[in-house]
Amino acid sequence: MKTGLYRFTLVLLILIEAFPLYAFIDGQQKEEKSYKIAVCDWMILKRQKIGAFQLAHELNADGLEMDMGSLGKRDSFDNKLRQPHFQQLFKETAQKFNIEISSIAMSGFYGQSFLERANYKALVQDCLNTLVVMNTKVAFLPLGGVKSGWEQDSELRSQLVKRLKEVGDMAASEGRVIGIETQLDARGEVKLLEEINSPGIKIYFKFQNALENGRDLYKELRILGKDRICQIHCTDTDGTTLSYNKRIDMKKVKRTLDRMGWSGWLVIERSRDKDDVRNVKKNYGTNVEYLKTVFQ
């Protein structure tokens, strides 16, 4: 009887001693899971290059937003990840450096019009296939190349809504999401999403757009709400790195996102020192470190 009581007491004491450590580890994991920090491969000058993973690791990023490759006047993206050799190489290298893929970007549509591409479905399907290869869920589709004024032009707008509905449903059928970037304000984006009416289309929110248009960044986030935002480009235009940026109160951003209940990837696109723009390690290393201080 005494031996049994002694053993029970000993086990209890061990558990009591160990509990704070378990609680700390568990809490740390949850905190890290709430917000992860990624960099864009094309902005660190490693568009679809194998060296992007090592560089992202050296920058202390959690992940990488990979690009589909340049588009220009080509019929298709210059995408290495259609080839089995590169698929295996990229996956193995990402694992080696412990870098997750936050998303796959179709950045070619910054310059090319999504409305003027007859093969838009094939281009998006190529991206969806790449999401499967790299085991991630979010595709990034900027609408910067669409002719300005589409927002008020009923014919252009209806064509765009139709196309986005089609590709959104393609994505949803595969359990994926396409995050679109527009120049609309938050209320305008809510209305656009309602018109598209597809679970496969959400907003890829970009701080720079809100700030450049003189909008209240924190209010815009609240209007969109957590369920309409799939991912965030959490940077401003080039000028200063984030810790010196006077237009963004990053702690207020975190409080806003916390209250919204949003969690996910914060992706660093710009916010480079204008006097040293091509110094990748300085600009992106500084921004990663700052964001981790605030969000993790």
Where are the model-predicted features located?
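Active-site acidic/histidine proton-transfer and metal-coordination neighborhood
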Residues: 57, 93-97, 110-203, 211-212
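Charged helix-capping and loop-helix junction motifs
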Residues: 80-87, 117-125, 153-164, 216-222, ...
